[in-house]
A protein has these predicted regions:
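Secondary-structure transition/capping motifs at alpha-helix termini
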Residues: 68-76, 97-110, 130, 134-139, ...
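Non-catalytic terminal extensions that flank enzyme cores
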Residues: 1-54, 77, 335, 348, ...
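Extended active-site and interfacial segments that coordinate phosphate-rich ligands
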Residues: 57-65, 215-251, 274-281, 291-298, ...
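Residue patterns forming the tRNA-binding/recognition surfaces of aminoacyl-tRNA synthetases
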Residues: 3, 8, 17, 21-25, ...
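Feature 926 captures the class I aminoacyl-tRNA synthetase adenylation module centered on the KMSKS loop
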Residues: 202, 395-455, 459, 503-546, ...
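N-terminal catalytic cores of NTP/NDP-binding nucleotidyl/phosphoryl-transfer enzymes
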Residues: 31-94, 147, 156, 217-219, ...
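Short, solvent-exposed turn/loop segments enriched in Gly/Ser/Thr/Pro and often Arg
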Residues: 34-36, 44-45, 80-91, 144-152, ...
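Active-site-adjacent "gating/activation" loops or surface patches in catalytic cores
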Residues: 254-260, 448-478, 644, 648-651
Length: 882
């Protein structure tokens, strides 16, 4: 071997170097190759304002694992990266930056402001991409896209104009969610609902012409009273049948409003009378449409009251509320105030309370657009993992409203609509139409609004591949295979990609959506700036390495479930990396200078066949788990195999043979060949999770290989199936564990070797122990081994160890307290009594017998038989000691 591993593993020595090697050699890049099957994942584009956080780290680690796995399986694997222009977030950042320079946005033209945005993007937009590289992400950076690059922008304009011509995009006055701080409309998906303590203000509305008669309404928002255009009651409510059609005096105004009957009103809720404010409530808006009510906007874009509020004009909405309530009380119209907890909509970005108000906005009509997206999940064309996400998905699609896509911002895709300066005629066109088709005027002004950021993101799976052009990339790599994303953006992005894929491409954009949960702190709290509990992934990488972070994020992680982050787990992952490194160094040191050849099956020892059989089964099991997207389960199996079976058992068993290269070269060769072969297989199985350390070790171990990344993923080999040897070595392991346990209990140091008697009535098992003494002679610290059918010739003071199928005896004579041994056996008996009770309880449970898989039931029956045998042996030993 021309190269050696350093004595200690330091991620800083290898990670940047290896990543540069991978990128320089184009290992991440994918081109159309019809001889290979494609596998495509599109990266959820991080915002250009973003910095790598734990959510990004988990999301991209999962994607990278799948891409590396499929690449090793021989697929033409494309991981399509890119970033999102993030209109609101970027605009806020740029405005802050300008403010620090003493510049106000209002002092700039639109073009000047956009220049500042592009400058900001150039300076900061690539930051998160560099951070994703530090994580080891093997995305095809040669194909990196941006949601506002020329190709993506063309796709956005194409979709907008197509949907407009189809009648599925329209402009109209509707209730929208208005953010008074960001001063833009936002979609329903961008509204979070927080439970807040508020009040019901009960207010009397005087009945016109009937002195002293009032209709009592209850409202949580008295300041919207100025926009009331009716009071509604349920037509079935007997209490109010006589006032339907009458007129009420609207308090604190000189207006009168009618009493109407509408089934929308819940007669059991509140007073059964509801103030109707069509311009400031989505439900009231619908009632207003049914009854042809006037829509009166009373709140300005900045959440101050307008002139319709009379003397309260100019006040903030909450100041108005307080002043109005005081005045209603003075007028004797405030009946009572009742505490009330209710959900309040807030903007998910700035957490300002959203103001529902009527605005002229652009909308996507959803009633027809959503149908294929619903059917695609129902018929299994698209699979959501975990399956419980189906309920969340359908809950949203069943209650979907038209999507408000216009935003009152400058940074983003400008709406391709043009208005005639003379007659106001509107034309939707990608290019400026030049002249008005109605009056011929040549002065056309573009709509000032931009599109919701998620409009362009919804096209991401196909716009990144060249759509609307019919490119070879699009034909080959679309549809994508898997989408990996957090469950928190199922409404923002996942559903919109699905219906956009069906509408524009005629097929689903991917066949599987793998959801992951949030990464929380060790106390289960969401990481946030306000709590100060955020953990920077780059800090973790700097301290422990990217591989340790990746392993920590995936181990024990189940699809859709939140996970807790513990520093102790990162340390454990780092310790695992050290163990892999040290084991590899030991193997390579012993291989150095030795001419290795492939041994015949007869030259392999039982332990060699056992570990080959184990890694063979691991390859099969891990592949099955990976194919089912059970990444956490797969890596746990790989981890356990490497740490336990390979390092703690096989290396220790084989170690003695590696020292006998001259004395027994055939045996040494078989051991060294097995060590190298199994380590190679294990490194490949570990590579998708821990790419850096596996690359460094693999390329040192297999110096003729370029990279582990393009090596073949391990497959199950029938010739490595050795069930008899597996069973034999497991018996030997039971023996070693039993002896080690009793030595620990008796405080007998490993250096003190003892004679070992193995008794078993099973002749086949006796043969196993006779033929495999080399496996356990050193691990059990024995001086002499005697295998026999019974305990003839064994001294009475010998300490016994009961293992499945056999009893071990260690004649420790005066080293062991006889009474202490009896105490130990009684403890063992108590332990077995509990296990027997548990096992019998399960096997007498009808629910378990009927619902559990047959193999599970059989497994429990086998356990019971084993416990019963062990109990008989313990009781026999106790009887002998009386």
């Amino acid at each position: 071997m021309s190269k050696e591993l350093s004595k200690t593993y330091d991620p800083k020595d290898i990670e940047d170097r290896l990543y540069k090697k991978w990128e320089d050699n184009g290992y991440f890049h994918a081109e159309v190759d019809r001889s290979k099957k494609p596998f495509t994942i599109v990266m959820p584009p991080p915002n250009i304002t973003g910095q790598l956080h734990m959510g990004h780290a988990l999301d991209n680690t999962m994607q990278d694992i799948l891409i590396r796995y499929k690449r090793m399986q021989g697929y033409n694997a494309l991981w399509q990266p890119g970033t999102d222009h993030a209109s609101i977030a970027t605009e806020v950042k740029v405005i802050q930056s300008l403010k620090e320079q003493g510049i106000n946005k209002a002092d700039l033209t639109r073009e000047e402001f956009l220049d500042k945005c592009w400058e900001w993007r150039k300076e900061y937009g690539g930051r998160i991409v560099k951070q994703l590289r530090k994580l080891g992400s093997s995305a095809d950076w040669q194909r990196e896209r941006f949601t506002m690059d020329e190709g993506c922008s063309h796709a956005v304009q194409e979709v907008f104009t197509k949907l407009y011509k189809k009648g599925w995009i329209y402009k109209g006055s509707r209730i929208v969610n208005w953010c008074p701080v960001c001063k833009t409309s936002i979609s329903d998906a961008e509204v979070e609902h927080e439970e807040q303590d508020g009040f019901f203000w009960h207010i009397n509305y005087p009945v016109v012409g009937e002195e002293g008669r009032f209709v009592e309404i209850a409202t949580t928002r008295p300041e919207t009273l100025f926009g009331d255009t009716a009071v509604a009651v349920n037509p079935e409510d007997e209490r109010y049948k006589d006032i339907v059609g009458k007129t009420l005096k609207l308090p604190m105004t000189d207006r009168e409003i009618p009493v109407i009957a509408d089934a929308y009103v819940d007669k059991e809720f509140g007073t059964g009378c509801v103030k109707i404010t069509p311009a400031h409530d989505p439900n009231d808006f619908e009632v207003g449409k049914r009854h042809n009510l006037e829509e009166i906007v009373v709140i300005n874009d900045d959440a101050t009251m307008n002139e319709k509020a009379g003397k309260y004009a100019g006040m903030d909405r909450y100041e108005c509320r307080k002043a109005l309530v005081d005045d209603l009380k003075k007028e004797g119209l405030l009946v009572k105030v009742v505490p009330h907890s209710h959900n309040v909509g807030v903007h998910d970005r700035c957490h300002t309370t959203v103001e529902p108000m009527i605005k002229q906005q652009w909308f996507v009509k959803m009633d027809e657009m959503i149908k294929p997206a619903v059917e695609g999940v129902k018929n299994g064309e698209i699979k959501l993992l975990p399956s419980r996400m189906d309920k969340t998905y359908f809950n949203w699609t069943d209650n979907i409203r038209d999507w408000c896509i216009s935003r009152q911002l400058w940074w983003g895709h400008r709406i391709p609509a043009w208005y005639c300066d003379d007659c106001g005629e509107m034309v939707v066109s990608i290019e400026n139409p030049g002249k008005c088709p109605k009056c011929g005027c040549t002065h056309m002004t573009q709509d000032p609004d931009t599109l919701d950021t998620w409009f362009s993101s919804a096209l991401w799976p196909f716009s990144t591949l060249g759509w609307p052009e019919k490119t070879e990339d699009l034909d080959y790599f679309y549809p994508n295979d898997v989408l990996v994303t957090g469950y928190d953006i199922i409404f923002f992005w996942v559903i919109r990609m699905i219906f956009s894929g069906y509408e524009q491409m005629g097929k689903a954009p991917f066949h599987t959506v793998l959801f992951h949960g949030l990464v929380r702190d060790s106390q289960g709290r969401k990481m946030s700036k306000s709590l100060g509990n955020g953990i920077d992934p780059l800090e973790v990488i700097d301290k422990y390495g990217a591989d340790a972070l990746r392993l920590t994020l995936i181990t024990g992680n189940a699809p859709g479930n939140d996970m807790r982050f513990y520093w102790e787990r990162v340390e454990a992952s780092r310790n695992f990396a050290n163990k892999v490194w040290n084991a590899s160094r030991f193997i390579m040191m012993n291989l150095d200078g030795f001419e290795l050849h492939t041994p015949s099956k007869d030259e392999l020892h039982a332990a060699d066949k056992w570990i080959l059989s184990k890694v063979n089964t691991l390859a099969k099991d891990a592949t099955e788990n990976m194919d089912k997207f059970e990444l956490g389960i797969a890596v746990q199996k790989v981890y356990d195999f490497i740490w336990d079976e390979f390092c703690d058992w096989y290396i220790e068993i084989a170690k003695v043979r590696t020292y006998k290269k001259d004395e027994d070269p055939v045996s040494a060769n078989a051991a060294l060949w097995t060590l190298k072969t199994v380590l190679t297989e294990a490194l490949k199985l570990l590579h998708p999770y821990m790419p850096f350390i596996t690359e460094e070790i693999f390329c040192t171990l297999q110096s003729e290989e370029e990279t582990i990344m393009l090596s073949k993923w391990p497959e199950y080999k029938e010739e490595w199936n050795f069930p008899a040897e597996e069973a034999a070595i497991e018996h030997c392991k039971d023996l070693v564990k039993g002896i080690r346990n009793v030595r620990t209990e008796m405080d007998v140091p490993p250096s003190r070797k003892a004679k070992l008697y193995i008794t078993s009535e099973d002749a086949g098992l006796r043969t196993v122990f006779e033929e495999n003494k080399e496996v356990y002679v050193n691990l059990a610290s024995t001086s002499e081994i005697i295998v026999q059918a019974d305990k003839n010739g064994i001294s009475e003071d010998a300490v016994s160890v009961v293992i499945p199928g056999a009893v071990l005896y260690l004649p420790l004579e005066d080293l062991v307290d006889f009474e202490k041994e009896k105490e130990r056996l009684h403890k063992e008996k108590d332990k077995l009594t509990k296990e027997l009770a548990r096992s019998k309880g399960m096997l007498s449970n009808e629910k378990f017998l009927n619902n559990a898989k047959p193999e599970k039931v059989q497994e429990e029956k086998d356990k019971l038989a084993k416990y019963e045998q062990m109990m008989a042996q313990v009781e026999a030993r106790l009887a002998q000691m009386k």
